[in-house]
Amino acid sequence: MADQIPLYPVRSAGAAASHRRAAYYSSAGPGPGADRRGRYQLEDESAHLDEMPLMMSEEGFENDESDYHTLPRARITRRKRGLEWFVCGGWKFLCTSCCDWLINVCQRKKELKARTVWLGCPEKCEEKHPRNSIKNQKYNVFTFIPGVLYEQFKFFLNLYFLVVSCSQFVPALKIGYLYTYWAPLGFVLAVTIAREAIDEFRRFQRDKEMNSQLYSKLTVRGKVQVKSSDIQVGDLIIVEKNQRIPSDMVFLRTSEKAGSCFIRTDQLDGETDWKLKVAVSCTQRLPALGDLFSISAYVYAQKPQLDIHSFEGTFTREDSDPPIHESLSIENTLWASTIVASGTVIGVVIYTGKETRSVMNTSNPNNKVGLLDLELNQLTKALFLALVVLSVVMVTLQGFAGPWYRNLFRFLLLFSYIIPISLRVNLDMGKAAYGWMIMKDENIPGTVVRTSTIPEELGRLVYLLTDKTGTLTQNEMVFKRLHLGTVSYGTDTMDEIQSHVLNSYLQVHSQPSGHNPSSAPLRRSQSSTPKVKKSVSSRIHEAVKAIALCHNVTPVYEARAGITGETEFAEADQDFSDENRTYQASSPDEVALVRWTESVGLTLVSRDLASMQLKTPSGQVLTYCILQMFPFTSESKRMGIIVRDESTAEITFYMKGADVAMSTIVQYNDWLEEECGNMAREGLRTLVVAKRTLTEEQYQDFESRYSQAKLSIHDRALKVAAVVESLEREMELLCLTGVEDQLQADVRPTLEMLRNAGIKIWMLTGDKLETATCIAKSSHLVSRTQDIHVFRPVTSRGEAHLELNAFRRKHDCALVISGDSLEVCLRYYEHELVELACQCPAVVCCRCSPTQKAHIVTLLRQHTRKRTCAIGDGGNDVSMIQAADCGIGIEGKEGKQASLAADFSITQFRHIGRLLMVHGRNSYKRSAALGQFVMHRGLIISTMQAVFSSVFYFASVPLYQGFLMVGYATIYTMFPVFSLVLDQDVKPEMAILYPELYKDLTKGRSLSFKTFLIWVLISIYQGGILMYGALLLFEDEFVHVVAISFTALILTELLMVALTIRTWHWLMVVAEFLSLGCYVASLAFLNEYFGIGRVSFGAFLDVAFITTVTFLWKVSAITVVSCLPLYVLKYLKRKLSPPSYSKLSS
């Protein structure tokens, strides 16, 4: 301990130090640490601070550079917060008291309440409920134009151009034709309005289609057709197979004999697995549909809420004696936007419209703004400052003669092209082109660009945060190991298990029908077989049976209809053929376990709400009654089932779950923890399986308490959990299972490529530490020669203090930390932990919750100011994906929720390499070149205007008017400039082969103040050469200076585009010649625009003049002088200091 460098200097722990600490913490108030304590719900550790005095006086930090200087930071933060409370407290009080009333009056948001819904009687509803209409439109007929204009003019630049355009209606400020300013602005607005109108019309059509869908409504007089938008709370709605459920309903009846049905929820939660739903038993037992109106029944439903995975309610039938009460849970609900997958269902509507779960969970994601857009915005502000400075300089040199303020405003108008209005249009069109290229890339099929505004972010990433299961791995589970405590079975010894199972059930089959199958192996122990072998055989039999029974898997059988060719689902007891059977479950782990029991001889052939059937190797079908089912939850991390063997009437409670949840439930053993660690180090996902045999009296007592808890309206979940926990005691440990999730194709080379590109990779997973570490090594996220620092579990501030010090002394090692330790460290040492973790080549966070994943992303963005990317495939990754600067979703076996919420969607992890190295890199470099060239285009013409005005005694007279100004940024130069989106410095194959090229992009050298200043100097040089050249060489033909300078300007811009291009595309050549042709053709039609001061001088362009040799060689000379030096400088730079890509492209 003596050689450790403490995070805070440790001094004597005397009474004075304790007093200072107490004073410090008492005065600190509810600072940031208090906020974090509330967020993470951790216990206060202040009582233990005497063990390790962490915060001392400021003197303790002197001359100790190794210590973190968080005490001054804490004091500054405390003082700032105190000042904020003093200044803002009164203001907030006034605003709250004065504005709350106004807000309440304006909004009057309806309070959501619990409700009582009578079956088939909408008129009995006590309150008015929203219409069941879907409305995704942003505007209506009256708000469309004002809304779109507001969205555009809330940005400073657009508002600036509007003010400039409106100024031309003032005669004293008018400096040209109105359309010179209104045409570009109108074009931008027209494009935006057209795009919004198309999107709005598509939304309107989709809404109309959904709201007009017809459903059968059950009434006293029979079935009637009703539109989805006309459905009300209390209606009884019939939904056919493959039909969308129109509103949130309670499941009353189904045509399926089992009283249950399957629904698809991929449009609600993104999960592709079917969900089993159960009808209310009271209404399912009714003989006919019409009997629903002959009973007096109602549903009590909780108030509408966001959580799609929970529901609390009751079903009550009043006309029976005594009244029937049934508890309702999530399995009795049919949420809107889900699809009925089997049978026909009847439900009573409980929530409609904006109160449905699907609508309440629909929110507009935060609009992500790319770093390049922010950088261009800063440069635009610099241009605006240059505009103001230049105008002031011109007025100053004019001597403030006359109405100088009017001249100042006129100069602002003359030089307004310094800020290019076409910049945003060009960049938006470029982003659309990049998205199209990404989706058309045959090397990454299935890639979808869902956010077209940030493709350049793919080229600036520094941190990549990835999920493990389904992202780095295939999410295809294969059963690999079964451990019984004394013996372990792997893939090469599975035939032994199959032999044990076969012998066990053959022995059972030879016994009388009343024989207990579970005791068969024990009775065999009386034979001549050694005792150990019989014991192992018995344990194998019990373990396999437990795995085959404890799950939520349902076998589904498909049969081909002869005439229609449609697929229908038959009853399971009609056909047990293996080739027709598929399994449906909420988790691929469940399916893997059931498939394994099938491979060793015990097959799940049928399952409904009340029973489950298993087929033994001898062909005998065993039936088990399902008494209770306890589904898996992320909080409990386990699931259980109580079954009764019909042949023996034996009641057994089976349970399986994660080792952390099961270790305190099972009986004492000395092997579980060790073997879980061993399997995890092999990269296996482990599950602990246990059982407990119940007597009839024990079960009846439990069932009564459980039913009572399920009928509770308040704190139902807590009461139910407490009852279930009463059974989870001293359970018999049966086995430990290991399932392997194999790596996706090309994960290793992809991760290596990303590391070589300078991207730091963090793996955030909910799996256990050993498994996460093993996957990190096998995927080469952490190289085998690299040290790994496993952050030991910490629960207090002092432990976190010591562990951070230990970690701080290590260099170039990967960090592995658990979610619990992460919470503690972030509570006390947020900045320090992030600072240290960012220095690691790789970080693995295990046992992470979805909230923690998103918080880690947010911390990285705030502390590093670097661009982050999150990639995942499941619903638990959505918050992380949305929190990152760039979110990538993978369409995997866990569904499409992550893919739909992401900015980019891919089908395999290996596609991220090409997405970043090729498309991300090209998008950033192209947009950087395009943005700077568009600004250059405005700067050069403004420079020429400044020279022109200075020559004419600083007069605020426009050099170019009318169509020349409109055409300059459109038909004359738009196509060549926009063709820069096709440019590339290296071939895609070279960019992938040398990912080090990507590392240069993170420095932002393609678009920086340095490159911006270079383009400013180029613009000033070229603008001055063009204008002074035109004035000097054409002294005798001075009236033609507009035509001369403008022609040289267009040629210069075309040559500059050619000079900027690094790889020619045939469309670039077409764009160059097309623009040149348009300009030459316009000379014959726009001759009135080519005279200087047409009204004053009366000069027009002589067509014969531009065909003379003198005109041509002088224009050519001016153009060459403006471009040749730049080409020479570029050539010398590439020879003397070549960029990295030039060595590969040569």
UniProtKB/Swiss-Prot annotation:
<dbReference type="GO" id="GO:0000287">
    <property type="term" value="F:magnesium ion binding"/>
</dbReference>
<dbReference type="GO" id="GO:0015914">
    <property type="term" value="P:phospholipid transport"/>
</dbReference>
<feature type="transmembrane region" description="Helical">
    <location>
        <begin position="144"/>
        <end position="164"/>
    </location>
</feature>
<feature type="binding site">
    <location>
        <position position="853"/>
    </location>
    <ligand>
        <name>ATP</name>
    </ligand>
</feature>
<dbReference type="Pfam" id="PF00702">
    <property type="entry name" value="Hydrolase"/>
</dbReference>
<feature type="binding site">
    <location>
        <position position="637"/>
    </location>
    <ligand>
        <name>ATP</name>
    </ligand>
</feature>
<feature type="binding site">
    <location>
        <position position="876"/>
    </location>
    <ligand>
        <name>ATP</name>
    </ligand>
</feature>
<dbReference type="InterPro" id="IPR008250">
    <property type="entry name" value="ATPase_P-typ_transduc_dom_A_sf"/>
</dbReference>
<protein>
    <recommendedName>
        <fullName>Probable phospholipid-transporting ATPase IIB</fullName>
        <ecNumber>7.6.2.1</ecNumber>
    </recommendedName>
</protein>
<feature type="active site" description="4-aspartylphosphate intermediate">
    <location>
        <position position="467"/>
    </location>
</feature>
<dbReference type="GO" id="GO:0140326">
    <property type="term" value="F:ATPase-coupled intramembrane lipid transporter activity"/>
</dbReference>
<feature type="binding site">
    <location>
        <position position="686"/>
    </location>
    <ligand>
        <name>ATP</name>
    </ligand>
</feature>
<dbReference type="GO" id="GO:0016020">
    <property type="term" value="C:membrane"/>
</dbReference>
<feature type="topological domain" description="Extracellular">
    <location>
        <begin position="1033"/>
        <end position="1040"/>
    </location>
</feature>
<feature type="binding site">
    <location>
        <position position="685"/>
    </location>
    <ligand>
        <name>ATP</name>
    </ligand>
</feature>
<feature type="transmembrane region" description="Helical">
    <location>
        <begin position="1041"/>
        <end position="1061"/>
    </location>
</feature>
<feature type="binding site">
    <location>
        <position position="767"/>
    </location>
    <ligand>
        <name>ATP</name>
    </ligand>
</feature>
<dbReference type="Pfam" id="PF13246">
    <property type="entry name" value="Cation_ATPase"/>
</dbReference>
<feature type="topological domain" description="Extracellular">
    <location>
        <begin position="1087"/>
        <end position="1105"/>
    </location>
</feature>
<feature type="topological domain" description="Extracellular">
    <location>
        <begin position="165"/>
        <end position="172"/>
    </location>
</feature>
<keyword id="KW-0460">Magnesium</keyword>
<comment type="similarity">
    <text>Belongs to the cation transport ATPase (P-type) (TC 3.A.3) family. Type IV subfamily.</text>
</comment>
<feature type="binding site">
    <location>
        <position position="469"/>
    </location>
    <ligand>
        <name>ATP</name>
    </ligand>
</feature>
<feature type="transmembrane region" description="Helical">
    <location>
        <begin position="939"/>
        <end position="959"/>
    </location>
</feature>
<feature type="binding site">
    <location>
        <position position="467"/>
    </location>
    <ligand>
        <name>Mg(2+)</name>
    </ligand>
</feature>
<dbReference type="GO" id="GO:0005794">
    <property type="term" value="C:Golgi apparatus"/>
</dbReference>
<dbReference type="InterPro" id="IPR023299">
    <property type="entry name" value="ATPase_P-typ_cyto_dom_N"/>
</dbReference>
<feature type="topological domain" description="Cytoplasmic">
    <location>
        <begin position="194"/>
        <end position="381"/>
    </location>
</feature>
<feature type="transmembrane region" description="Helical">
    <location>
        <begin position="408"/>
        <end position="427"/>
    </location>
</feature>
<dbReference type="InterPro" id="IPR006539">
    <property type="entry name" value="P-type_ATPase_IV"/>
</dbReference>
<feature type="binding site">
    <location>
        <position position="873"/>
    </location>
    <ligand>
        <name>Mg(2+)</name>
    </ligand>
</feature>
<keyword id="KW-1278">Translocase</keyword>
<dbReference type="Pfam" id="PF00122">
    <property type="entry name" value="E1-E2_ATPase"/>
</dbReference>
<dbReference type="GO" id="GO:0016887">
    <property type="term" value="F:ATP hydrolysis activity"/>
</dbReference>
<dbReference type="InterPro" id="IPR032631">
    <property type="entry name" value="P-type_ATPase_N"/>
</dbReference>
<dbReference type="Pfam" id="PF16212">
    <property type="entry name" value="PhoLip_ATPase_C"/>
</dbReference>
<keyword id="KW-0067">ATP-binding</keyword>
<feature type="binding site">
    <location>
        <position position="469"/>
    </location>
    <ligand>
        <name>Mg(2+)</name>
    </ligand>
</feature>
<feature type="transmembrane region" description="Helical">
    <location>
        <begin position="1066"/>
        <end position="1086"/>
    </location>
</feature>
<feature type="binding site">
    <location>
        <position position="467"/>
    </location>
    <ligand>
        <name>ATP</name>
    </ligand>
</feature>
<dbReference type="InterPro" id="IPR023298">
    <property type="entry name" value="ATPase_P-typ_TM_dom_sf"/>
</dbReference>
<keyword id="KW-0445">Lipid transport</keyword>
